[in-house]
Amino acid sequence: MTNLNKKVRVGIIGSGNIGTDLLIKTMRSESLTCTIFAGRNFNSAGMKRANELGVHISDRGIQAILDDPSICDVVFDATSAQAHIEHWRELEPLDKTVIDMTPAKVGGFCIPAINAEEILASGNRNINMVTCGGQSSIPIANAISSVHPEFEYIEVASSIASRSAGPATRANLDEYIDTTEKALKQFTGAQRTKAILILNPAVPPIDMQTTIYAKIDRPNIAAIDAAVREMVERLKRYVPGYQLVLPPTLDGNRVVTTVKVMGNGDYLPQYAGNLDIINCAAIAVTEMISSLRYGK
Protein backbone atom coordinates (compact mmCIF):
# COMPACT_ATOMS: atom_id res chain seq x y z
CA MET A 1 0.00 0.00 0.00
CA THR A 2 1.42 3.38 -1.02
CA ASN A 3 1.44 6.32 1.35
CA LEU A 4 -1.31 7.95 -0.70
CA ASN A 5 -3.61 5.02 0.10
CA LYS A 6 -2.80 4.91 3.80
CA LYS A 7 -5.07 6.36 6.45
CA VAL A 8 -4.41 7.27 10.05
CA ARG A 9 -6.10 4.67 12.24
CA VAL A 10 -8.22 6.25 14.95
CA GLY A 11 -9.40 4.74 18.22
CA ILE A 12 -12.31 6.41 20.00
CA ILE A 13 -12.90 6.07 23.75
CA GLY A 14 -16.38 7.16 24.78
CA SER A 15 -19.58 6.21 22.99
CA GLY A 16 -21.68 9.25 23.89
CA ASN A 17 -22.67 12.16 21.64
CA ILE A 18 -19.12 13.45 21.15
CA GLY A 19 -17.62 10.02 20.49
CA THR A 20 -20.33 8.91 18.10
CA ASP A 21 -20.26 12.13 16.09
CA LEU A 22 -16.46 11.82 15.90
CA LEU A 23 -16.97 8.30 14.56
CA ILE A 24 -19.23 9.52 11.74
CA LYS A 25 -16.84 12.33 10.86
CA THR A 26 -13.86 9.95 10.92
CA MET A 27 -15.60 7.49 8.61
CA ARG A 28 -16.34 10.29 6.13
CA SER A 29 -12.75 11.52 6.10
CA GLU A 30 -10.55 10.60 3.16
CA SER A 31 -7.47 10.33 5.40
CA LEU A 32 -8.81 8.75 8.61
CA THR A 33 -10.42 5.45 9.56
CA CYS A 34 -11.81 4.23 12.89
CA THR A 35 -10.38 0.87 13.92
CA ILE A 36 -11.80 0.65 17.46
CA PHE A 37 -14.83 2.29 19.08
CA ALA A 38 -14.80 1.62 22.81
CA GLY A 39 -17.42 2.40 25.42
CA ARG A 40 -19.02 0.69 28.38
CA ASN A 41 -22.40 -0.49 27.15
CA PHE A 42 -23.11 -2.45 23.96
CA ASN A 43 -26.73 -1.28 24.19
CA SER A 44 -25.90 2.43 24.00
CA ALA A 45 -27.03 4.32 20.91
CA GLY A 46 -23.44 5.05 19.94
CA MET A 47 -22.31 1.44 20.15
CA LYS A 48 -25.29 0.30 18.12
CA ARG A 49 -24.52 2.89 15.44
CA ALA A 50 -20.86 1.86 15.28
CA ASN A 51 -21.87 -1.78 14.97
CA GLU A 52 -24.23 -0.92 12.10
CA LEU A 53 -21.31 0.78 10.34
CA GLY A 54 -19.18 -2.33 10.69
CA VAL A 55 -16.70 -0.71 13.07
CA HIS A 56 -14.91 -2.90 15.61
CA ILE A 57 -16.51 -2.18 19.00
CA SER A 58 -15.67 -3.00 22.60
CA ASP A 59 -17.41 -2.48 25.94
CA ARG A 60 -14.09 -2.40 27.81
CA GLY A 61 -13.29 1.29 27.33
CA ILE A 62 -9.60 2.16 27.25
CA GLN A 63 -8.68 -1.43 28.10
CA ALA A 64 -9.53 -2.39 24.52
CA ILE A 65 -6.59 -0.26 23.35
CA LEU A 66 -4.26 -1.24 26.18
CA ASP A 67 -4.82 -4.91 25.32
CA ASP A 68 -3.93 -4.29 21.66
CA PRO A 69 -1.90 -1.08 21.27
CA SER A 70 -1.30 -1.79 17.57
CA ILE A 71 -5.00 -1.34 16.82
CA CYS A 72 -4.74 2.44 16.31
CA ASP A 73 -2.33 5.33 15.77
CA VAL A 74 -4.34 8.17 17.30
CA VAL A 75 -6.77 8.06 20.22
CA PHE A 76 -9.74 10.39 20.66
CA ASP A 77 -10.62 10.55 24.36
CA ALA A 78 -14.28 11.57 24.52
CA THR A 79 -14.90 10.62 28.15
CA SER A 80 -14.47 13.11 31.01
CA ALA A 81 -11.74 15.38 32.35
CA GLN A 82 -11.17 13.22 35.40
CA ALA A 83 -11.06 10.01 33.36
CA HIS A 84 -8.65 11.51 30.83
CA ILE A 85 -5.99 12.14 33.47
CA GLU A 86 -5.85 8.42 34.21
CA HIS A 87 -6.17 7.48 30.53
CA TRP A 88 -3.13 9.59 29.66
CA ARG A 89 -1.03 7.86 32.30
CA GLU A 90 -1.84 4.56 30.59
CA LEU A 91 -1.57 5.75 26.98
CA GLU A 92 1.59 7.86 27.23
CA PRO A 93 3.97 4.84 27.40
CA LEU A 94 2.35 3.45 24.23
CA ASP A 95 3.67 6.37 22.14
CA LYS A 96 0.19 7.27 20.91
CA THR A 97 -0.98 10.72 19.91
CA VAL A 98 -4.01 11.46 22.07
CA ILE A 99 -6.61 14.05 21.11
CA ASP A 100 -8.25 15.09 24.36
CA MET A 101 -11.88 16.15 23.87
CA THR A 102 -12.29 16.91 27.58
CA PRO A 103 -11.29 20.06 29.51
CA ALA A 104 -8.57 18.17 31.39
CA LYS A 105 -5.84 20.51 30.02
CA VAL A 106 -3.13 17.88 30.42
CA GLY A 107 -1.64 18.56 27.00
CA GLY A 108 -1.12 21.61 24.82
CA PHE A 109 -4.15 23.66 23.79
CA CYS A 110 -5.07 23.44 20.11
CA ILE A 111 -7.24 25.82 18.10
CA PRO A 112 -6.66 24.64 14.50
CA ALA A 113 -7.23 28.09 12.96
CA ILE A 114 -4.45 29.46 15.16
CA ASN A 115 -1.83 26.90 16.16
CA ALA A 116 -2.39 23.41 14.71
CA GLU A 117 0.88 23.44 12.75
CA GLU A 118 2.79 24.77 15.74
CA ILE A 119 1.52 22.16 18.18
CA LEU A 120 2.16 19.29 15.77
CA ALA A 121 5.68 20.56 15.09
CA SER A 122 6.32 20.66 18.85
CA GLY A 123 5.94 16.89 19.06
CA ASN A 124 3.32 17.20 21.79
CA ARG A 125 1.48 13.87 21.85
CA ASN A 126 -1.32 15.03 24.14
CA ILE A 127 -3.38 17.61 22.29
CA ASN A 128 -6.20 19.30 24.19
CA MET A 129 -9.12 20.67 22.18
CA VAL A 130 -9.97 23.17 24.97
CA THR A 131 -13.79 23.41 25.07
CA CYS A 132 -16.66 24.07 22.68
CA GLY A 133 -16.85 27.67 23.89
CA GLY A 134 -13.10 27.96 23.53
CA GLN A 135 -13.18 26.76 19.93
CA SER A 136 -15.88 29.32 19.06
CA SER A 137 -14.58 32.33 21.01
CA ILE A 138 -10.79 32.09 21.10
CA PRO A 139 -10.25 32.59 17.34
CA ILE A 140 -12.19 35.87 17.53
CA ALA A 141 -10.37 36.94 20.70
CA ASN A 142 -7.05 36.08 19.07
CA ALA A 143 -7.95 38.15 15.99
CA ILE A 144 -8.79 41.12 18.22
CA SER A 145 -5.51 40.73 20.11
CA SER A 146 -3.59 40.77 16.83
CA VAL A 147 -4.76 44.37 16.43
CA HIS A 148 -4.71 45.36 20.11
CA PRO A 149 -2.28 43.10 21.99
CA GLU A 150 -2.43 45.39 25.01
CA PHE A 151 -6.07 44.86 26.04
CA GLU A 152 -6.52 43.88 29.68
CA TYR A 153 -9.87 42.06 29.94
CA ILE A 154 -11.89 39.70 27.80
CA GLU A 155 -15.15 37.93 28.59
CA VAL A 156 -16.87 35.23 26.54
CA ALA A 157 -20.41 33.98 27.03
CA SER A 158 -21.65 30.91 25.19
CA SER A 159 -25.29 29.89 25.10
CA ILE A 160 -26.05 26.31 24.05
CA ALA A 161 -29.17 24.18 23.79
CA SER A 162 -29.72 22.32 27.04
CA ARG A 163 -30.53 19.20 25.03
CA SER A 164 -27.02 19.23 23.56
CA ALA A 165 -25.36 19.08 26.99
CA GLY A 166 -24.87 15.45 27.96
CA PRO A 167 -23.81 14.02 31.33
CA ALA A 168 -20.07 14.58 30.72
CA THR A 169 -20.62 18.24 29.77
CA ARG A 170 -22.70 18.86 32.89
CA ALA A 171 -20.21 17.05 35.13
CA ASN A 172 -17.30 19.12 33.77
CA LEU A 173 -18.72 22.65 34.07
CA ASP A 174 -16.07 23.86 36.53
CA GLU A 175 -13.31 22.39 34.36
CA TYR A 176 -14.96 23.97 31.29
CA ILE A 177 -14.74 27.45 32.80
CA ASP A 178 -11.19 27.05 34.10
CA THR A 179 -9.86 25.58 30.85
CA THR A 180 -11.57 28.16 28.63
CA GLU A 181 -10.22 31.04 30.73
CA LYS A 182 -6.68 29.66 30.74
CA ALA A 183 -6.74 29.13 26.97
CA LEU A 184 -8.08 32.66 26.43
CA LYS A 185 -5.11 34.04 28.34
CA GLN A 186 -2.68 31.92 26.34
CA PHE A 187 -4.02 32.90 22.93
CA THR A 188 -4.64 36.61 23.63
CA GLY A 189 -2.22 37.70 26.34
CA ALA A 190 -5.12 39.28 28.23
CA GLN A 191 -4.43 39.88 31.91
CA ARG A 192 -7.94 38.90 32.99
CA THR A 193 -10.43 36.55 31.35
CA LYS A 194 -13.90 35.29 32.16
CA ALA A 195 -15.89 32.45 30.58
CA ILE A 196 -19.62 31.87 30.99
CA LEU A 197 -21.67 28.90 29.77
CA ILE A 198 -25.46 29.12 29.61
CA LEU A 199 -27.59 26.00 29.10
CA ASN A 200 -30.75 27.26 27.41
CA PRO A 201 -33.80 24.98 27.84
CA ALA A 202 -35.77 26.66 25.04
CA VAL A 203 -37.91 24.50 22.74
CA PRO A 204 -37.26 24.32 19.86
CA PRO A 205 -33.55 24.22 20.82
CA ILE A 206 -31.38 27.22 19.99
CA ASP A 207 -28.20 27.20 17.92
CA MET A 208 -24.95 27.75 19.79
CA GLN A 209 -24.15 31.44 20.11
CA THR A 210 -21.04 33.01 21.62
CA THR A 211 -20.48 36.67 22.43
CA ILE A 212 -16.99 38.06 23.00
CA TYR A 213 -16.51 41.25 25.04
CA ALA A 214 -13.08 42.89 24.94
CA LYS A 215 -12.16 45.93 27.02
CA ILE A 216 -9.89 48.06 24.84
CA ASP A 217 -8.70 51.63 25.14
CA ARG A 218 -9.37 53.54 21.87
CA PRO A 219 -10.07 50.47 19.68
CA ASN A 220 -9.45 50.53 15.93
CA ILE A 221 -12.80 49.06 14.89
CA ALA A 222 -11.99 48.94 11.17
CA ALA A 223 -8.79 46.97 11.74
CA ILE A 224 -10.48 44.68 14.27
CA ASP A 225 -13.34 44.03 11.84
CA ALA A 226 -10.93 43.05 9.06
CA ALA A 227 -8.98 40.71 11.36
CA VAL A 228 -12.16 39.09 12.69
CA ARG A 229 -13.62 38.52 9.21
CA GLU A 230 -10.38 36.93 8.05
CA MET A 231 -10.44 34.61 11.07
CA VAL A 232 -14.08 33.66 10.44
CA GLU A 233 -13.20 32.58 6.90
CA ARG A 234 -10.32 30.53 8.28
CA LEU A 235 -12.67 28.72 10.64
CA LYS A 236 -15.25 28.05 7.94
CA ARG A 237 -12.71 25.84 6.18
CA TYR A 238 -13.25 23.18 8.84
CA VAL A 239 -16.46 24.41 10.55
CA PRO A 240 -18.86 25.27 7.71
CA GLY A 241 -21.62 26.33 10.13
CA TYR A 242 -19.52 29.04 11.80
CA GLN A 243 -21.12 32.47 11.23
CA LEU A 244 -20.43 36.05 12.23
CA VAL A 245 -23.72 37.37 13.64
CA LEU A 246 -22.61 40.69 15.12
CA PRO A 247 -19.43 42.21 13.62
CA PRO A 248 -17.09 43.98 16.05
CA THR A 249 -19.12 46.84 17.53
CA LEU A 250 -18.14 49.52 20.00
CA ASP A 251 -20.28 49.47 23.16
CA GLY A 252 -18.95 52.05 25.59
CA ASN A 253 -15.39 50.96 26.35
CA ARG A 254 -15.97 47.43 25.08
CA VAL A 255 -15.77 45.82 21.67
CA VAL A 256 -18.59 43.28 21.30
CA THR A 257 -18.65 40.48 18.71
CA THR A 258 -21.09 37.59 18.36
CA VAL A 259 -20.77 34.35 16.42
CA LYS A 260 -23.16 31.45 15.87
CA VAL A 261 -22.38 27.81 15.14
CA MET A 262 -24.76 25.47 13.33
CA GLY A 263 -23.85 21.80 13.31
CA ASN A 264 -23.30 19.70 10.19
CA GLY A 265 -25.96 17.23 11.29
CA ASP A 266 -23.59 14.27 10.82
CA TYR A 267 -24.88 12.42 13.89
CA LEU A 268 -26.11 15.20 16.15
CA PRO A 269 -28.94 17.68 15.45
CA GLN A 270 -27.93 20.90 13.73
CA TYR A 271 -28.58 22.88 16.90
CA ALA A 272 -25.71 21.02 18.61
CA GLY A 273 -23.14 23.35 17.08
CA ASN A 274 -21.26 23.39 20.37
CA LEU A 275 -20.43 19.69 19.98
CA ASP A 276 -19.90 19.97 16.24
CA ILE A 277 -17.29 22.72 16.42
CA ILE A 278 -14.98 20.90 18.84
CA ASN A 279 -15.34 17.68 16.82
CA CYS A 280 -14.63 19.48 13.54
CA ALA A 281 -11.54 20.98 15.17
CA ALA A 282 -10.36 17.55 16.34
CA ILE A 283 -10.86 16.05 12.88
CA ALA A 284 -9.01 18.98 11.28
CA VAL A 285 -5.89 18.52 13.43
CA THR A 286 -5.94 14.74 12.99
CA GLU A 287 -6.17 15.11 9.22
CA MET A 288 -3.09 17.31 9.47
CA ILE A 289 -1.34 14.44 11.27
CA SER A 290 -2.29 12.20 8.34
CA SER A 291 -0.95 14.77 5.89
CA LEU A 292 2.37 14.95 7.73
CA ARG A 293 2.69 11.17 7.82
CA TYR A 294 1.39 10.19 4.42
CA GLY A 295 1.45 13.36 2.36
CA LYS A 296 -2.28 13.77 1.89
Curated annotation (Swiss-Prot):
Keywords linked to the UniProt accession: Aromatic hydrocarbons catabolism, NAD, Oxidoreductase
Domain of life: Bacteria
Record GO biological process: 3-phenylpropionate catabolic process
Binding site for NAD(+): 15-18, 164-172, 274
GO MF assignments: acetaldehyde dehydrogenase (acetylating) activity; NAD binding
Catalytic activity: acetaldehyde + NAD(+) + CoA = acetyl-CoA + NADH + H(+)
Entry EC number(s): 1.2.1.10
Active-site residues, as the UniProt record annotates them: 132 (acyl-thioester intermediate)
Pathway named in the protein's UniProt entry: Aromatic compound metabolism; 3-phenylpropanoate degradation
NCBIfam families per UniProt: ac_ald_DH_ac, PRK08300.1
Subunit structure: Interacts with MhpE.
Protein role: Catalyzes the conversion of acetaldehyde to acetyl-CoA, using NAD(+) and coenzyme A. Is the final enzyme in the meta-cleavage pathway for the degradation of aromatic compounds.
Name by which UniProt lists this protein: Acetaldehyde dehydrogenase
